From Swiss-Prot:
Keywords: FAD, Flavoprotein, Nitrogen fixation, Oxidoreductase. This is Protein FixC. GO terms for biological process: nitrogen fixation. Its cofactor is FAD. Belongs to the ETF-QO/FixC family. It comes from Azorhizobium caulinodans (strain ATCC 43989 / DSM 5975 / JCM 20966 / LMG 6465 / NBRC 14845 / NCIMB 13405 / ORS 571). GO terms for molecular function: oxidoreductase activity.
């Protein structure tokens, strides 16, 4: 195993880990990145959304060779009951710009490319290596890691934990608590392959245009969760995720929900005739601002999913991961350049910089929303989608019924389902959590 000491060790080679390692290496630090997979991205078969602004800060010319799928020109939001959907669509030619704002990607391909940039920057990347625990001195300061390789103890001034939402290393070292089931979602995803021209016809796309569909409603059977559909070049990424605590409580299975989503009348035609080649499950942080653990300590910082950095409202994760990794690396570099120890006091600069960025500002804005949706999941993910769907059908159906009577019928349905007190209470709580 490696005997030398490093300025920094990064555990994990996802978005946050690669961003941190790349930044550290470019700053001239001696950095080692450890990844348990065969290569970066080997365990990430799913599709995802890439936010260009954050990647440009790391790799300005990424569009020249990054494995991008489609640039997004349309966003669709669906509220589903069992037989229909009520939708809000936004599509703009402004997104057919020279440098598009968002792309769909296949993580296995993209992460591998991202890792190549890390290696080009001079970092040492060691794959197929599992970090089993953190090495701490007599005072509890993290001074390195132990791996599953023989003689696998490696030392560094600071360790960057980018190990994903489970955060087992930090938990094992008593640096943080294990994430609560209500703060983590389990998402199951499939890749449905179709000819490129078929995808473009079904989604009304031209060239490399792409679309994202996000869906909520009865597909989650009253649990807190959402479904999603991403159009890639020659495949469709489709999946659904719900809180782990809801799966435990209801006994529902992720695969059962996925089949329910795929068979929905609004979804089935989009994937008809497709070939499923890949299936994966993935844990996603959903606890929001109040679930963020301790972000730094003596000799360590935590970034990305491991830090619960995910904006569930806007479905932003990869940009928060890349930004937190970059900011953590910048903070470490500043401490290093001042020749100061990697103490908790000095590494608190990382949190200060996060607070000054959009990352924690956005998460703080929606700090009360995750708990509100979880506590009221039956109403927001079951009752209201059914009521809204019936209201829309009542509105567009022409059957000779006077419009005044139709309006009364719709209002009566809402009041009978939730009462006036419940309706105003839900609206007030939702508005307060959103502001």
């Amino acid at each position: 195993m490696i005997d030398e000491k490093f300025d920094a060790i990064v555990v994990g080679a996802g978005m946050a880990g690669n961003a941190a390692t790349l930044t550290l290496a470019r700053r001239g630090l001696k950095v080692l990145q450890l990844e348990r997979g065969e290569y970066s991205g080997s365990k990430n078969v799913q599709g995802a959304i890439l936010y260009a602004d954050m990647l440009e800060k790391l790799v300005p010319d990424f569009r020249e060779d990054a494995p991008l799928e489609r640039h997004l020109v349309e966003q669709r939001f669906w509220m589903l009951d069992d037989r229909s959907h009520v939708g809000l669509h936004y599509r703009s030619e402004d997104f057919n710009e020279e440098k598009p704002n968002r792309y769909t990607i296949i993580r296995a391909q993209f992460d591998k490319w991202f890792s190549s940039k890390v290696k080009e920057a001079g970092a040492t990347v060691l794959c197929e290596t599992t970090v089993t625990e953190l090495v701490q001195d007599a005072y509890g300061k993290v001074i390195g890691v132990k791996t599953d390789r023989s003689g696998g103890q490696i030392h560094a001034d600071v360790v960057v934990l980018a190990e994903g939402v489970n955060g087992l290393l930090g938990t094992k070292a008593h640096l943080r608590e294990r994430p609560k089931p209500e703060h983590v979602a389990l998402a199951v995803k499939e890749m449905h392959f179709l000819p490129r021209e078929t995808i473009e016809a079904r989604f009304n796309l031209q060239g490399d245009e792409g679309v994202v569909i996000e869906a909520a409603g009865t597909i989650s059977r009253g649990m807190t969760g959402m479904g999603f559909i991403y159009a890639n070049k020659e495949c469709i990424s489709l999946g659904i995720g719900c809180l782990v605590s809801d799966f435990q409580k209801t006994g529902e299975t992720p695969y059962g929900l996925l089949e329910r989503f795929k068979s929905h009348p609004s979804v089935a035609p989009l994937i008809e005739g497709s070939e499923v080649k890949e299936y994966a499950a993935h844990l996603i942080p959903e606890g929001g601002f109040k679930a963020i653990p301790q972000l730094f300590g003596d000799g360590w910082v935590v970034v990305g999913d491991a830090a619960q950095l995910n904006n569930a409202v806007h479905r932003e994760g990869s940009n928060l991961a890349m930004t937190s990794g970059r900011i953590a690396a910048e903070a470490i570099f500043q401490v290093k350049s001042r020749r100061e120890p990697m103490s908790a006091k000095n590494l608190s600069l990382y949190k200060t910089m996060l607070e000054e960025s959009f990352v924690l500002k956005d998460m703080k804005k929606y700090k009360d929303l995750p708990a509100l949706l979880h506590i009221n999941s039956q109403n927001f993910f079951l009752t209201y989608p059914q009521l809204v769907s019936k209201a829309m059908q009542n509105f567009v159906r022409v059957d000779g019924t006077p419009k005044v009577e139709k309006e009364k019928r719709t209002l009566r349905a809402f009041v009978e389902a939730r009462s006036w007190f419940g309706l105003f209470g839900d609206a007030f709580r939702f508005a307060r959590a959103w502001r």
